[in-house]
């Protein structure tokens, strides 16, 4: 009903949403939907990719559940607090950190992996001006 008490004369009008293109050949509407991000639409390239990305997280969960079953709730809570404390301690932003204490807590200090050989700090891709990097980290820039 409109202000005069009469119904709309355009009963068979088409809504605006149906006027937009749809289907496999639809063009992306930047004004209504914003920029499209291809990264979110991609599927993992290999079935093992997701497993490899979450390997350390799954390993930690398994270790914590085993530790909880053996020693109770205190042991995994203590280890998780130590993990948080160790992850917060870092070097200056322009220096690479090996995070040796985190490796010791996880038990990775006795193993040799490809990251031990191929992760040479002198060949790092991220080399910047030390003063600028510290100022950025402290929020001065």
Curated annotation (Swiss-Prot):
Pfam families: UMP1. One of its GO terms (cellular component) is nucleus. There is a cross-link at residue 39 (Glycyl lysine isopeptide (Lys-Gly) (interchain with G-Cter in SUMO2)). The keyword Iron-sulfur does not apply. This is Proteasome maturation protein. It comes from Homo sapiens. A motif (High-affinity association with the preproteasome) lies at residues 68-72. It is found in: Cytoplasm, Cytosol; Nucleus; Microsome membrane. Molecular chaperone essential for the assembly of standard proteasomes and immunoproteasomes. Degraded after completion of proteasome maturation. Mediates the association of 20S preproteasome with the endoplasmic reticulum. Induction: By IFNG/IFN-gamma. The keyword tRNA-binding does not apply.
């Amino acid at each position: 009903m409109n202000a005069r008490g009469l119904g709309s004369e355009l009963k068979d009008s088409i809504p605006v949403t149906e006027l937009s293109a749809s289907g496999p050949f639809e063009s992306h509407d930047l004004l209504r939907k914003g920029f499209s991000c291809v990264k979110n639409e991609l599927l993992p390239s290999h079935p093992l990719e997701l497993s490899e990305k979450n390997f350390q997280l799954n390993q930690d969960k398994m270790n914590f559940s085993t530790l909880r079953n053996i020693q109770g709730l205190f042991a995994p809570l203590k280890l998780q607090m130590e993990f948080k404390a160790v992850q917060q301690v870092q070097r200056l932003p322009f220096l690479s950190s090996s995070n040796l204490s985190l490796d010791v807590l996880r038990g990775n200090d006795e193993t040799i992996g490809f990251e031990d050989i191929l992760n040479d700090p002198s060949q790092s891709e991220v080399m910047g001006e030390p003063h600028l990097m510290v100022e950025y980290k402290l929020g001065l820039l």
